[in-house]
């Protein structure tokens, strides 16, 4: 078997004073925090597509990467070489998990039968790699957006045969995820949306998408898949408008089709900002609704209006996000999955390590600071105090449904109430949080 990353040693934790570019400065997998190791809290995963499939092209230019695992006599041989490279990378980096789309790991072929046969062979290859290395699958998914057949959608397509083709891919991708002991299955509707309303029946397409998701849930129970089903929100790109716009939109969709107890969300940082929200907002919203499943850890560029999928470097942002996750009990089956890609000019194989090492150190620093915020309870206590009156008889009775509008109007008049505003102390709280982050 070829060694693809000969110049890179196994990446180890060396501490903040290390000058070794191939060492973690802050990510110490075995460090104990709140009763768990750092690795158990973060559950880090590497994505297959950007890391091993993307060749550095963009809409204005051709490939800039020259990946040795792409040079093979056949597509299947290239897929197997890619698997060798991937698991060498996972092992040297020391991550516990990875994730993939079906066509990341297997050639699509020239027919649906070739697709099925190729994928089945590659699942066996992946299974052997997992057993040999101990690397686990965080989640699997099907790519129902890249092939031209999906230009008008997959589940929302006007043609039911394309719906059936997408169903075939999801059927086999779910089965593969179960066979590989994956802990989640993700559904991202990259083409589930519209370019123009002039040729779009919104009600019909939403009904099609709802039925597709119901079928996914049915299949989960049929095959005994014990992982979590996840929808990944995104407002646009590649379509003008996607139906899974943001967390709140997805929750409304799930409620409409009776799926709110069956499917959670996989939040991506860059998707949140494209929707006009902060990453913190989307995580907090998902946690408040009880539907946070997993996180695609990356960041966008504030000056650009598209999905740049950069490696996360903001400890400020990820401290607040990790704080929300810890408040809600931490990850169960999900984790921080790096949906990240190098910049086109970062051509060297070593750059893959630099990007992931920095991202893992960012998560480690953020976790340590979020844990301190949880343990000190200062922020939580201030929030509790802000809403304390809702625990008194009036507030509790309102929420319990014991009062009508008329009751409250009579109460206000009888008691001549004159409630006064109280400072929200935002600036003080921001200073407090900075004290944790920059200490």
Swiss-Prot record:
GO biological process, one term: D-xylose metabolic process
InterPro entries, per database record: Xyl_isomerase-like_sf, Xylose_isom_bac, Xylose_isomerase
Group of enzyme by EC: isomerase
Broad class of the protein's primary localization: cytoplasm
Compartments (UniProt record): Cytoplasm
Protein residues bound to Mg(2+) 1: 232, 268, 296, 339
GO cellular component term of the entry, any: cytoplasm
Molecular-function annotations in GO: magnesium ion binding; xylose isomerase activity
Location of the active site: 101, 104
Residues binding Mg(2+) 2: 268, 271, 307, 309
UniProt keyword annotation of Ribonucleoprotein present: no
Known EC number: 5.3.1.5
Named cofactor requirement(s): Mg(2+)
Keywords: Carbohydrate metabolism, Cytoplasm, Isomerase, Magnesium, Metal-binding, Xylose metabolism
Record has Acyltransferase as a keyword: no
Cofactor remark: Binds 2 magnesium ions per subunit.
Stated family: Belongs to the xylose isomerase family.
PANTHER family: PTHR48408, XYLOSE ISOMERASE
Name this protein carries in UniProt: Xylose isomerase
């Amino acid at each position: 078997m070829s060694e693809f990353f000969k110049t890179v040693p196994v990446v180890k934790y060396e501490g903040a004073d290390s000058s070794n570019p191939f060492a973690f400065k802050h990510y110490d997998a075995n460090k104990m925090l709140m009763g768990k190791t750092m690795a158990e809290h973060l559950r880090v995963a590497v994505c297959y597509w950007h890391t091993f499939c993307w060749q550095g092209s963009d809409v204005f230019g051709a490939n800039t990467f020259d990946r040795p695992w792409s040079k093979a006599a056949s597509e299947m041989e290239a897929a197997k070489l890619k698997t060798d490279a991937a698991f060498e990378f996972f092992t040297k980096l020391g991550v516990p998990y990875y994730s993939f789309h079906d066509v990341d790991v297997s050639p699509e072929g020239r027919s649906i039968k070739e697709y099925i046969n190729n994928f089945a062979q590659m699942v066996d290859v992946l299974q052997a790699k997992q057993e040999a290395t101990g690397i686990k699958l965080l989640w699997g998914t099907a790519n129902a957006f890249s092939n031209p057949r999906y230009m008008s959608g997959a589940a929302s397509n006007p043609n039911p045969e394309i719906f059936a083709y997408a169903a075939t891919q999801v059927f086999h991708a779910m089965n593969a995820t179960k066979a590989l002991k994956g802990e989640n299955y993700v559904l991202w509707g990259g083409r589930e949306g519209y370019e123009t309303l002039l040729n779009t029946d919104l009600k019909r397409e939403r009904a099609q998408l709802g039925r597709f998701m119901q079928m996914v849930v049915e299949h989960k129970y049929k095959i005994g898949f014990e992982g979590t089903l996840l929808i990944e929100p995104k407002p646009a790109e590649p379509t003008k408008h996607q139906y899974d716009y943001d967390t709140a939109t997805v929750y409304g969709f799930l409620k409409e089709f009776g799926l709110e107890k069956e499917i959670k969300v996989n939040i991506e940082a860059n998707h949140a900002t494209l929707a006009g929200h902060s990453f913190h907002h989307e995580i907090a919203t998902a946690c408040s609704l009880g539907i946070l499943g997993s996180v695609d850890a990356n960041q966008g560029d504030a000056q650009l209006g598209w999905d740049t999928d950069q490696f996360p470097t903001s400890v400020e942002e990820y401290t607040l996000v990790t704080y929300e996750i810890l408040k809600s009990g931490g990850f169960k089956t999900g984790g921080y999955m790096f949906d990240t890609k190098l910049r086109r000019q970062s051509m060297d194989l070593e750059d893959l390590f630099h990007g992931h090492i920095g991202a893992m150190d960012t998560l480690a620093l953020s976790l340590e600071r979020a844990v301190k915020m949880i343990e000190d309870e200062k922020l939580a206590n201030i929030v509790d105090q802000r809403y304390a009156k809702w625990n008194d008889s009036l507030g509790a009775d309102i929420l319990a449904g014991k009062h009508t509008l008329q009751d409250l109007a009579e109460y206000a008049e009888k008691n001549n109430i004159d409630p006064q505003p109280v400072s929200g102390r935002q600036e003080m709280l921001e200073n407090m949080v900075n004290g944790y982050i920059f200490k």
